[in-house]
């Protein structure tokens, strides 16, 4: 591949001890960390290929402890996509997910209302798009210690409007999916943001004599219309005084 790789900045958030570092190191270094060593801030980079397209992931592993709440705002400002982690064997970590999600929304809304700084992800992803978030129920290997059901995880993800997966950093189950699906959302948002748009429904013509015309509807779906077919739109009037 020639040229510079697309960089995606992902931030891993969640309570202390839920396996944020274990997931990150399993993704980037392909091994499982057995011991728990509280993290303040660690950054990892890895070149990956997602859907036959190479890119660079920058993954920020963050502290889950309450005393680092002030630092978390800056981590969120710098992030493009987020991996929200709880442990299926910890009801309290699951209960705190909404607090992390609220903080993400608050910080991103604040960023959207202020000028973006150089290099800010705000400049590359439309601020009107939802923040890409993956909810991860980690430690799915701890079957006998489960305190949070899979159904509860799905229900919370629907409530928060984000994706959901259960994973095991120890057994390397759904680790790549947890991160790669966030990248896929970011790519879709960038593609949609780069499409030329007009007031109302966005349309791109491929027509000409004897050809069809394609367009994008307001819900993002692609449609088509053959020559001679009418569409409901008001004629454009130009008055020269």
From Swiss-Prot:
Motif (Effector region): 36-44
Residues annotated to bind GTP: 17-22, 33-39, 63-64, 138-141, 168-170
Propeptide: 239-241
Residues found modified as Cysteine methyl ester: 238
Biased composition (Polar residues): 191-205
InterPro entries: P-loop_NTPase, Small_GTP-bd, Small_GTPase, Small_GTPase_Ras-type
Chief location: membrane
Gene disruption phenotype: Displays slight reduction in conidiation, but normal growth, appressorium formation, and plant infection.
Keyword set includes Glycoprotein: no
Gene Ontology molecular function: any one: GTPase activity
This protein's GO CC annotations: plasma membrane
Comp. bias regions, Basic and acidic residues: 219-230
PANTHER family per record: RAS, DI-RAS, AND RHEB FAMILY MEMBERS OF SMALL GTPASE SUPERFAMILY (PTHR24070)
Physiological role: Modulates the activity of the adenylate cyclase catalytic subunit and therefore affects the biosynthesis of cyclic-AMP. Plays a role in both surface attachment and surface recognition of appressoria, a highly specialized infection structure for plant penetration. Regulates appressorium formation by coordinated regulation of cAMP signaling and Pmk1 MAPK pathways.
Name by which UniProt lists this protein: Ras-like protein 1
């Amino acid at each position: 591949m020639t040229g510079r790789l697309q960089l995606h900045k992902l931030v891993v958030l969640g309570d202390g001890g839920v396996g944020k570092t274990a997931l990150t190191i399993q993704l980037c270094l392909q091994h499982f960390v057995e011991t728990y060593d509280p993290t303040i801030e660690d950054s990892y980079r890895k070149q990956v290929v997602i859907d036959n397209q190479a890119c660079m992931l920058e993954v920020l592993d963050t502290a889950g402890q309450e005393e680092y709440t002030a630092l978390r705002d800056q981590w969120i400002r710098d992030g493009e996509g987020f991996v929200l982690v709880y442990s299926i064997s910890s009801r309290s970590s699951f209960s705190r997910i909404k607090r992390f999600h609220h903080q993400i929304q608050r910080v991103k809304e604040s960023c959207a209302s202020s000028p973006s700084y150089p290099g800010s992800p705000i400049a590359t992803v439309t601020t009107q798009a939802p923040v890409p978030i993956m909810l991860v129920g980690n430690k799915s290997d701890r079957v006998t210690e489960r305190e949070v059901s899979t159904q509860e995880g799905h229900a919370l993800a629907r409530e928060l409007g984000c994706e959901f997966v259960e994973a095991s950093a120890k057994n390397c189950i759904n680790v790549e999916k947890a991160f790669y699906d966030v990248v896929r959302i970011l790519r879709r948002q960038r593609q949609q943001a780069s499409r030329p748009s007009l007031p109302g429904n966005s349309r791109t013509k491929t027509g000409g004599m004897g050809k069809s015309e394609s367009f994008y509807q307001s819900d993002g779906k692609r449609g088509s219309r053959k020559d001679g077919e009418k569409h409901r739109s008001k004629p454009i009037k130009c008055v020269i005084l």
